[in-house]
Amino acid sequence: MKKKKKSEGYMTLSPPLSMQGKMKSLFLVVLLIIAALAGVFTYQGLQYDFETLDGETYLWQDLNGQWVVVNYFAPWCAPCLREMPELAAFNQSLPDNTRLFAINYDPKTKPELKAMTEKFAIAVPVIVSSPDTKLPMTKPPYLPATFIVGPDGKIKDTIMGEVTAVHLRQRLTELKGAD
């Protein structure tokens, strides 16, 4: 095909897309749609702040209006293990409008975490620590550490060191009275 100058009134035409080119374009469009849908479904599937070992998922906003106690522990922390029966006792008779969760200081897989909770007879809901876990507090500098989150979602108290069921109940009563 001979090109003519624009001044002669002719334009250069590009050859039509071949069938192979059309198929490639169609394939890319379909691939982009699938990728976009997969991203949307993945995003919607991970719309929670934390998950417990028993598979329950939670958003902090859904816990608004409740008092939430979060206890950081580790199997290598003797005081943490000593306070676990106290936390279990507290969990058995939670004050009104109160939730209790424990979270292992070191990230573990679900099977590792399950084995650990069975080995140490941990009888409170345990949060699975993962990169996706969102808590209103940062990891504490030492253990055990217990955080009390108020109904507004803000940390109301941090207790560093061992706690007892009586101490937790007393502290919650004080905080609820001040609120």
Label the predicted regions.
Residues 118-122, 128-173:
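Thiol/disulfide oxidoreductase modules built on the thioredoxin-like
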Residues 69-70, 100, 146:
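Hydrophobic beta-strand anchors of alpha/beta hydrolase catalytic cores
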Residues 48-68, 135:
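A short beta-strand-turn-helix
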Residues 1-51, 179:
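N-terminal targeting signals for export/organelle localization
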Residues 48, 72-73, 116, 124, ...:
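Conserved hydrophobic/aromatic "anchor" residues
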